[in-house]
């Protein structure tokens, strides 16, 4: 179990919908500090959060997740002055706009990766940090394809690939930063907005989704925090239909283990065995 008591949490996402509900639950876990980085200031929401736990310090920065990494560094230098350190980084910024592929990819994937690359040095044990946990909030259509939201699905597949890659023991044993993901199923805040299919053939299905049964943001937020508390490095969870499921991960490439051993080996014989195994 991951104990959130006394932790310093940084949440990169709009303070509304799933992010707001997740933050509400975090505020009941006796965290010491909560930094919220979002594109638009939402003072009423922040006031609601502060009313839950007055002793928890809340900090806010207007933040564009698609900015260049050099600009991000300036923001997080300021964040660290207030936060001292970051125990938990939650990446929750998301966009589903099939008519704007660049914005969808930049928000959901590139921006998330740049955020992680910027924050990791502050957390890395070998660089003076204390280790910690990175939580990528993503979607179930990052696990299975969506014929309707193709660009969105592609970006979320990327989040899963990045999460699993960064969680490899190659990194975790060095930096002490665990990485996990929570894949949310259809949630009310998502289906309530106007949705466009990638191709016009899928628009009927996109329109129908607005009337489909889905989980509430409050239940989803609760399950995200529960997944964090149960987390281990490399885990992928599904938060859907009010429930929480830990995935059993599969390797589809049968040479994955051998290839990693080859990359880590300096022994010519071991390398020759790998080459022979590919034939």
Swiss-Prot record:
Please list the residues that bind substrate.
Answer: 139
Q: Which UniProt keywords apply?
A: Oxidoreductase
Q: What Gene Ontology cellular component terms go with this record? A: cytoplasm
Entry superkingdom:
Eukaryota
Q: Which GO molecular-function terms appear in the entry? A: oxidoreductase activity
Entry's Pfam families? adh_short
Keyword Oxidoreductase, does the record have it?
Answer: yes
Question: What CDD domains does the database record attribute to this sequence?
Answer: ADH_SDR_c_like
InterPro entries in the cross-refs:
ADH-rel, NAD(P)-bd_dom_sf, Sc_DH/Rdtase_CS, SDR_fam
What protein name applies here?
Alcohol dehydrogenase-related 31 kDa protein
């Amino acid at each position: 179990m991951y104990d959130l008591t006394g932790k310093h949490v940084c949440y990169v996402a709009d303070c509304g919908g799933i992010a707001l509900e997740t933050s509400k639950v975090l505020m009941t876990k006796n965290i010491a500090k909560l930094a919220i980085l979002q594109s638009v200031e939402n003072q009423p929401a922040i006031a609601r959060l502060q009313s839950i736990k007055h002793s928890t310090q809340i900090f806010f920065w207007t933040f564009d997740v698609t900015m260049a990494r050099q600009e991000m560094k300036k923001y997080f230098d300021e964040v660290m002055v207030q936060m001292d350190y970051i125990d938990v980084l939650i990446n929750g910024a998301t966009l589903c706009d099939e008519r704007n592929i660049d914005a969808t990819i930049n928000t959901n994937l590139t921006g998330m990766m740049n955020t992680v690359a910027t924050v990791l040095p502050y957390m890395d044990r070998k660089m003076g940090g204390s280790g910690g946990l990175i939580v990528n909030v993503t979607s179930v259509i990052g696990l299975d394809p969506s014929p309707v939201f193709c660009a969105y699905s592609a970006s979320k597949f990327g989040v899963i690939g990045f999460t699993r890659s960064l969680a490899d023991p190659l990194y975790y044993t060095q930096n002490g930063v665990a990485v996990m993901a929570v894949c949310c199923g259809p949630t009310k805040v998502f289906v309530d907005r106007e949705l466009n299919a990638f191709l016009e053939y899928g628009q009927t299905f996109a329109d129908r989704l607005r009337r489909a049964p889905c989980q509430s943001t409050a239940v989803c937020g609760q399950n995200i925090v529960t997944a964090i508390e149960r987390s281990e490095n490399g885990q992928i969870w599904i938060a859907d239909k009010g429930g929480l499921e830990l995935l059993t991960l599969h390797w589809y490439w049968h040479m994955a283990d051998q290839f990693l051993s080859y990359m880590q080996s300096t022994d010519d014989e071991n390398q020759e065995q790998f080459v022979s195994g590919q034939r």
